């Protein structure tokens, strides 16, 4: 949610900021702005809407070598230019961009800023006014004013601050919100995400919570809030420019759907050797063996991926698995087993709700494993162990390849633990072979895109509501499929356990109500789900079937190649991703950037 970019040094700041903001569009936003300065002039430009709207307002005379930029997703105050970042202090001297939520902003406003005039309703404007007050009224230095403000502010934040009277420096601080420093020759940068600056540098430095950074063109100084200087090593980001471009695709989502066979094969090469033996960190295996219960904590699509792996993990590891919504567990952690282990699923590794749970787990001494797509992310740094899903950058807001990669990665983990326990079922599970078949199944489904588009046009062209139904793992896939459809097509859609239809949901079925039925796993499951299909069809529902090969009948709509039952959720979800994509496309919507949504939810 939101994005920050900043640069100081021998570069064209306007170009770098705008390119960086464009790379952060996937995070979600409703307004944007930049502040650019040099020794002779400063320019502050803000706009509601897309980055293209901001670019249209920037004149050729907006130039400078230092600047900060921001994409905003409204939390405090509506989406207006006054509420868009960057924000300025009372006199306009100080300029600030901010990601996060300042929890005590009203207290700060009444306690410290009586008589100040505010242009908008944001918590960020309160922060920059506070810094300005400490400098211009209380006569503190800029650095001391920033530190004092940080000692008062409560909540989550990533700040980038500039002084229009000394434009060769950017001041940075963070707490519970992601921020990176990009390193260059004769210039340095700050950004929320390495993708924003990968065109300019591949060298980055992590900063931790409650650390302050002073950026000049030739130096990066990191201190704690008491002023003690800290040493930070840099790392090279393993990103390729081709990975973050759309290429010939109209939307990132379609590109990322198409990349899933490659992701499956990448996971095979990462977690298996040439002979097919699974390779997972032995310390992770030992930790799971010592646990008496695994708790999977996640949000959104990652939560659904957890459900899709629950049965597999339990069967192969002989360890009970419990699922939890991270946003709920952060406030109320239920009674735990005697030897719990937490597994946190997060594409970005920055999900604020999951981090809140992790902080509690660490305080309780509970071992944790983060399964993520982003090395060096907050969750990966703060958890006991990390397992990467190697899906490559996922830019479309609606997650596709991260979901399937999480399931595949956890399959390697489950098999590794089962083998270590001597479980025969795990020893017999030829995961490399089976996952190769999954990749082929995905490719077969992707070759039928025209068929899916045709089915979607007939089923969902004008509807406002739809339902997915399934049993067992198909129910878990139905939950994810419904989320995907509602996210990007704005069709109200719910995924239900097929057996629950008679317990209330069937009252919503009327003439031409779209119902998409998922059928895999066994003849018994297929028989019962087909009974539910007859029930909704008798009430006028328009039914579309997605059926695993071998369970299909004449008249079924989409046939999916048969794969191992543990991996069936990967194969079965692919048609539903395409259904969501074409439903959005046919309605003329922005597939990659659905309204009101952010890719990485970095505030609670």
UniProtKB/Swiss-Prot annotation:
Its EC number is 2.6.1.16. Keywords: Aminotransferase, Cytoplasm, Glutamine amidotransferase, Repeat, Transferase. It is found in: Cytoplasm. GO terms for molecular function: carbohydrate derivative binding; glutamine-fructose-6-phosphate transaminase (isomerizing) activity. GO terms for biological process: carbohydrate metabolic process; fructose 6-phosphate metabolic process; protein N-linked glycosylation; UDP-N-acetylglucosamine metabolic process. InterPro entries: GATase_2_dom, GFAT, GFAT_N, GlmS/AgaS_SIS, GlmS/FrlB_SIS, Ntn_hydrolases_N, SIS_dom, SIS_dom_sf. The active site is at residues 2, 599. Residues 2-218 form the Glutamine amidotransferase type-2 domain. PROSITE patterns: GATASE_TYPE_2, SIS. Residues 284-423, 456-594 form the SIS domain. It catalyses: D-fructose 6-phosphate + L-glutamine = D-glucosamine 6-phosphate + L-glutamate. Gene3D superfamilies: Glucose-6-phosphate isomerase like protein, domain 1 (3.40.50.10490), Glutamine Phosphoribosylpyrophosphate, subunit 1, domain 1 (3.60.20.10). One of its GO terms (cellular component) is cytosol. Its main location: cytoplasm. Homodimer. HAMAP family: GlmS. NCBIfam families: glmS (TIGR01135), PRK00331.1 (NF001484). Catalyzes the first step in hexosamine metabolism, converting fructose-6P into glucosamine-6P using glutamine as a nitrogen source. This is Glutamine--fructose-6-phosphate aminotransferase [isomerizing]. It comes from Streptococcus pyogenes serotype M18 (strain MGAS8232). The lineage of its organism: Bacteria, Bacillati, Bacillota, Bacilli, Lactobacillales.
